[in-house]
Amino acid sequence: DYWTALSYYKYFPPPYAMIDCVAADLKLFADLGVDSFYAETADYMDASQQFVPLKFWLAYQLLVDPHQPAEPLVKTFTDGYFGAAAGKMRDYLRYLRGRIDAEAQFKMLRDEPHKLAYLDRSFFQISETLFDEAEALVQAGGLQAKHIEVERFALDGALLFMWPWLERKLPAGETLPFERDTLIQRYERGWKSLISSRYSR
């Protein structure tokens, strides 16, 4: 029942993207001879879903030709949306998709997301580094920087939520390689950017 599939732990923000689903689903519908369909997307408001503008734009393009390859479209969109940081943002998207695909745990997402295999220390270190590198490539405070900030919000939220579990797995005397105060401040900025991007039209 998709109405209740994610009803538990609703305040936990595990980062994810639906890019692969969009391309595969629309191609399947076309192959089955579907002429039209209604897509309910209430979850676009979900603060943990990343690359939402890309998802919608990609879907519009694939509705015109569902059999065209998705990756060139992803490149076209990200080049314009993230500017000089597009390559780093695609690197993150590929990494996110790869980790989730390799370690898919749907029921865990619903019941115990803090036990998701992909949300480990390595995931956060690699992902945060990619975002650091992406932000360094664009003008601070500019539109492209805001776009990056919105995507980073879900990652930072997940790291803050996972902090206690990540700490428990550390060897004695070791600390997490993140500045918690800096992370909280960036999370607050990201929340404001997210609200502004979605509701201040």
Task: Locate the predicted segments by residue.
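Structured mid-domain segments that build the active-site/substrate or prosthetic-cofactor binding neighborhood
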Residues: 1-87, 91
